C-alpha cells in the first residue's frame, strides 16, 4: 500500500479544476444533445448557465409524494450504469447524474448529499465517511478516509466525570470530514461541475421531502431527544408534535448551507461562514470544536487495501476501518475448509461462520488509527492464511465455546448507525461508500443556524475509565488523542476478478455490518444465489460478547417477512448457541456484474493475459439490489 496522501481541507474551489470540468461537460452535451432534449421534455433535466444541471427526476418526485415504495422494484438491471442506495429518491438522483455523462464519483457526491437530507438519522455533512473508488481506466482502487477526528482539545480522560457526554450532546462530536472527502474524490475523478451536484439535495431540503417509513420510525423512537433540542425540534416537529411517516419535512437552513458550499467550495465549511456558524452553535451547546479544528482537517487518500479471498480480490478501507481486515480474516478461515457447506444443508456452514466471526471480533480490537498506533503486526496476523488455518483447527463442528476461548483481551467497540450506497457507471468505474453520524441523529443536536445534525463519533473511541457490559478493559489502541480517528465497523467493498469489476457492496448497522456483508458475499459467490435472494435472505449476527446468536425474525416496511428457519435455529441450539430474536438487521446494498456466457468471459480475460495488455473493461449486465430491511430502492440508467 502506498503512503497516504494527506489532502488539504480545500479552503476554496479549485477554479482551474472547475473550468476543466465545465469544458468536459460541454463536450458531453454535444454527444448527448438529442438524448438530453428528449429527457428534458419528460422532466428529467433542465438547462442552466450553459451546463447540464441535474434535478430531481420526475420518477423521484412522484415517488416522494406517493410513498408507493412497494411499486418500485428492489432490483434493477442495466448495461449502462446502476445505483443501489437506501432511499429511492437518492438512487434516482444518482442515476440521473450518470445519464448526463457523470462519473460514478459525480453520482456519489449527489447521492451522499441527498441521503444526508432525507435520512438525517443516519448520515449528513456533519459526519464522516469511507469511500472506495475503483477506476477501470488504470485498474486501481483508491480509499478516501473522511472519518471524523477528535478535536484538538480532546483527551483520553475527557469523559471521566460524565460518561454520558461521550454519546449524547455536542461534546460527543468529532470534526466532520464528509465535505472535504467528497471534494477530494470529485477533484480526482469527477467529470461534471461541482455546483449542480448539490442542487437535488438543496431542492429537497428547501422545498421539503416526504418522511419515509424508516425515518418516521427513527423519529418516533427519539421523541424526547428531538423535542428537547431547539434545532432538532425546529426540523423534526410541528406544533409540539414530532413528524410522522407521510408528512413533509423542511430544513431551509441546511439548504442554505449546501448552497453556500456548492458556490464557494469546501472552504465555506472548513474556513468560512458555514463553519463559523456551526462552531458557534456547537460551542453554545457545550461542544469544544473550533475553527482551528475545521481548518486542520485532512482527508487521507491511499491505495485501497486489496486482499485475495476465495478467488476474488476484495478492495476496501485500511484501518481505522476494521471492516476489510475483519471480512478478509473470516473469509480466510472459511476458505481453509475443503467443503464449507455440506450436501445436507447450509446449517453447518453457518455454525462455522459464527465461530470464525467470534475469533475475528476478539482480534479486531487490536486495530486503531495507523497514524497514531502501530497496527502492522495485528493486521498481518489477521490477514495471514496460515493463522486462519490455525484458527480453523480450533473450530469444532459440534459445539461452541464461552468468550474467553477466543482469547479476547479488550472491550468491544459498539458503533452504530450509518448509510451505504454503491454506484457503477457505464465505463465500469465503481464507488462503494458508507457514511455516518453514528447513533440515530448522532449527538441529538442540530445546529440551528446551519441545519446540520452533529455526529457523536467520539463514542467510537475507547476511554480508560469506561465500564462496558463485557467487563473487559478498554482497548488502548483506540484511546482518544487530538486529530485521531476512531476504529470503525464500516465495510465498503469493491470486488474484482482478474482486474474486472465483479461487485460492489457494503452495509449500514454498526457492529452488524461485517456479519451482514460476509453473508451477502457468501450467498452470492459461494452459494450462487441470485443477487436479490443473496441480499434478502435472513441473517444471523454475533458480537462475541454477549455470547448470543441474534437471528432475524421480522416484517419489513414493505410487508415482507424475513426470518431464520426453525431447522437452522434447532441446529445451532444443539451446538450450544444461545439464540435471541432480532427485529431488524444491517442494511446491505449490492451491485453485481454478470455475463450471459461465462466461457466467453473467461476467454476474453485469457486473451488479455496472453497479449500482456488489458483490453477494454468487460461490460456485462449490472444488477443492483437495495435491501428491503430499509425503504431504499435501486435505479438504473
Curated annotation (Swiss-Prot):
Q: What happens when the gene is disrupted?
A: No visible phenotype under normal growth conditions.
Give the annotated active site. 418
Q: Which key words tag this protein in UniProt?
A: Acyltransferase, Detoxification, Glycoprotein, Hydrolase, Membrane, Transferase, Transmembrane, Transmembrane helix, Vacuole
The residue stretches assigned to a coiled coil in this entry are: none
Keyword Nucleotide-binding recorded? no
Catalytic activity, EC: 3.4.19.13, 2.3.2.2
Q: What induces it?
A: By auxin.
Pfam families in the record: G_glu_transpept
Q: Which GO terms describe its biological process?
A: glutathione catabolic process; response to toxic substance; xenobiotic metabolic process
Q: Which GO terms describe its molecular function?
A: glutathione gamma-glutamylcysteinyltransferase activity; glutathione hydrolase activity; leukotriene C4 gamma-glutamyl transferase activity
Q: What is its main location?
A: membrane
Topology within the bilayer? Single-pass membrane protein
Instruction: Please list the residues annotated as glycosylated.
Output: 50, 271, 374, 398, 553
Q: In which tissues is it expressed?
A: Expressed in roots, cotyledons, leaves, flowers and siliques.
Q: Where are the transmembrane segments?
A: 28-48
Residues engaged in binding L-glutamate: 147, 436, 438, 457, 460, 488-489, 509-510
List the catalysed reactions.
Answer: an N-terminal (5-L-glutamyl)-[peptide] + an alpha-amino acid = 5-L-glutamyl amino acid + an N-terminal L-alpha-aminoacyl-[peptide]; glutathione + H2O = L-cysteinylglycine + L-glutamate; an S-substituted glutathione + H2O = an S-substituted L-cysteinylglycine + L-glutamate
| Pathway listed | Sulfur metabolism; glutathione metabolism
Domain of life here?
Answer: Eukaryota
Q: Where in the cell is it found?
A: Vacuole membrane
Report the function annotation for this chain.
Answer: May play a role in protecting plants from some xenobiotic chemicals by degrading vacuolar glutathione conjugates into cysteine conjugates.
* Sequence similarity: Belongs to the gamma-glutamyltransferase family.
What the entry lists under PANTHER family is as follows: GAMMA GLUTAMYL TRANSPEPTIDASE (PTHR11686), RE13973P (PTHR11686:SF9)
Q: Provide the protein name.
A: Glutathione hydrolase 3
Q: Which gene encodes it?
A: GGT3
Amino acid at each position: 500500500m502506498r503512503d497516504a496522501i494527506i489532502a488539504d481541507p480545500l479552503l476554496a474551489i479549485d477554479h482551474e479544476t472547475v473550468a476543466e470540468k465545465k469544458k468536459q461537460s460541454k463536450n458531453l452535451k454535444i454527444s448527448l444533445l438529442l438524448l438530453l432534449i428528449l429527457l428534458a421534455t419528460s422532466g428529467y433535466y433542465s438547462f442552466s448557465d450553459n451546463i447540464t444541471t441535474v434535478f430531481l427526476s420526475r420518477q423521484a418526485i412522484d415517488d416522494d409524494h406517493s410513498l408507493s415504495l412497494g411499486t418500485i422494484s428492489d432490483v434493477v438491471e442495466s448495461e449502462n450504469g446502476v445505483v443501489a442506495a437506501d432511499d429511492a429518491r437518492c438512487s434516482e438522483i444518482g442515476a440521473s447524474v450518470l445519464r448526463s455523462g457523470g462519473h460514478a464519483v459525480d453520482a456519489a457526491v449527489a447521492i451522499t448529499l441527498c441521503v444526508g437530507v432525507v435520512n438525517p438519522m443516519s448520515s449528513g455533512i456533519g459526519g464522516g465517511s469511507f469511500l472506495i473508488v475503483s477506476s477501470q481506466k488504470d485498474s486501481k482502487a483508491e480509499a478516501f478516509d473522511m472519518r471524523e477526528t477528535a478535536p484538538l482539545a480532546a483527551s483520553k480522560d475527557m469523559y471521566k466525570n460524565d460518561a454520558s457526554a461521550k454519546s449524547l450532546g455536542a461534546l460527543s462530536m468529532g470534526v466532520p470530514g464528509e465535505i472535504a472527502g467528497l471534494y477530494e474524490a470529485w477533484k480526482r475523478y469527477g467529470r461534471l461541475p461541482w455546483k449542480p451536484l448539490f442542487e437535488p439535495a438543496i431542492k429537497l431540503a428547501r422545498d421539503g421531502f416526504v418522511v419515509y417509513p424508516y425515518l418516521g420510525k427513527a423519529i418516533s423512537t427519539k421523541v424526547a431527544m428531538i423535542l428537547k433540542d431547539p434545532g432538532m425540534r425546529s426540523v423534526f416537529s410541528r406544533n409540539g408534535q414530532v413528524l410522522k411517516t407521510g408528512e413533509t419535512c423542511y430544513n431551509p437552513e441546511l439548504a442554505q448551507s449546501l448552497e453556500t458550499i456548492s458556490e464557494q467550495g469546501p472552504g465555506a465549511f472548513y474556513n468560512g461562514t458555514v463553519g463559523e456558524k456551526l462552531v458557534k452553535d456547537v460551542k453554545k451547546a457545550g461542544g469544544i470544536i473550533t475553527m482551528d479544528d475545521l481548518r486542520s482537517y485532512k482527508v487521507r487518500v491511499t491505495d485501497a487495501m486489496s486482499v485475495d479471498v476465495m478467488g476474488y480480490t476484495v478492495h476496501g478501507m485500511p484501518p481505522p476501518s476494521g471492516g476489510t481486515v475483519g471480512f478478509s480474516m473470516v473469509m480466510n478461515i472459511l476458505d481453509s475448509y475443503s467443503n464449507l457447506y455440506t450436501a445436507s444443508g447450509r446449517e453447518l456452514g453457518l455454525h462455522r461462520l459464527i465461530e470464525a466471526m467470534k475469533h475475528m471480533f476478539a482480534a479486531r480490537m487490536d486495530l486503531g488509527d495507523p497514524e497514531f498506533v502501530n497496527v502492522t503486526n495485528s493486521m498481518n496476523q489477521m490477514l495471514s492464511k496460515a493463522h486462519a488455518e490455525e484458527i480453523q483447527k480450533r473450530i469444532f463442528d459440534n459445539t461452541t465455546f464461552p468468550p474467553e476461548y477466543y482469547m479476547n483481551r479488550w472491550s468491544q467497540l459498539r458503533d452504530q448507525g450509518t448509510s451505504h450506497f454503491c454506484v457503477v457507471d457505464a465505463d465500469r468505474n465503481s464507488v462503494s461508500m458508507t457514511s455516518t453520524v453514528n447513533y440515530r441523529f448522532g449527538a441529538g443536536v442540530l445546529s440551528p443556524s446551519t441545519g446540520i445534525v452533529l455526529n457523536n463519533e467520539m463514542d467510537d473511541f475507547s476511554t480508560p475509565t469506561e465500564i462496558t457490559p463485557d467487563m473487559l478493559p478498554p482497548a488502548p489502541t483506540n484511546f482518544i488523542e487530538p486529530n485521531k480517528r476512531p476504529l470503525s465497523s464500516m465495510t465498503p467493498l469493491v470486488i474484482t476478478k482478474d482486474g474486472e469489476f465483479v461487485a460492489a457492496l457494503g452495509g449500514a448497522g454498526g457492529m452488524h455490518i461485517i456479519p451482514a456483508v460476509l453473508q451477502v458475499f457468501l450467498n452470492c459467490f459461494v452459494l450462487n444465489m441470485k443477487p436479490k435472494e443473496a441480499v434478502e435472505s435472513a441473517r444471523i449476527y454475533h458480537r462475541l460478547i454477549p455470547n448470543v446468536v441474534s437471528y432475524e425474525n421480522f416484517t419489513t416496511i414493505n410487508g415482507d417477512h424475513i426470518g431464520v428457519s426453525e431447522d437452522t435455529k434447532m441446529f445451532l441450539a444443539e451446538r450450544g448457541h444461545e439464540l435471541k430474536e432480532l427485529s431488524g438487521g444491517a442494511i446491505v446494498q449490492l451491485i453485481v456484474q454478470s455475463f450471459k456466457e461465462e466461457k466467453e468471459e473467461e476467454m476474453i480475460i485469457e486473451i488479455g493475459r496472453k497479449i500482456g495488455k488489458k483490453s477494454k473493461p468487460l461490460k456485462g449486465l449490472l444488477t443492483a439490489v437495495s435491501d428491503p430491511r430499509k425503504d431504499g430502492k435501486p435505479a438504473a440508467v
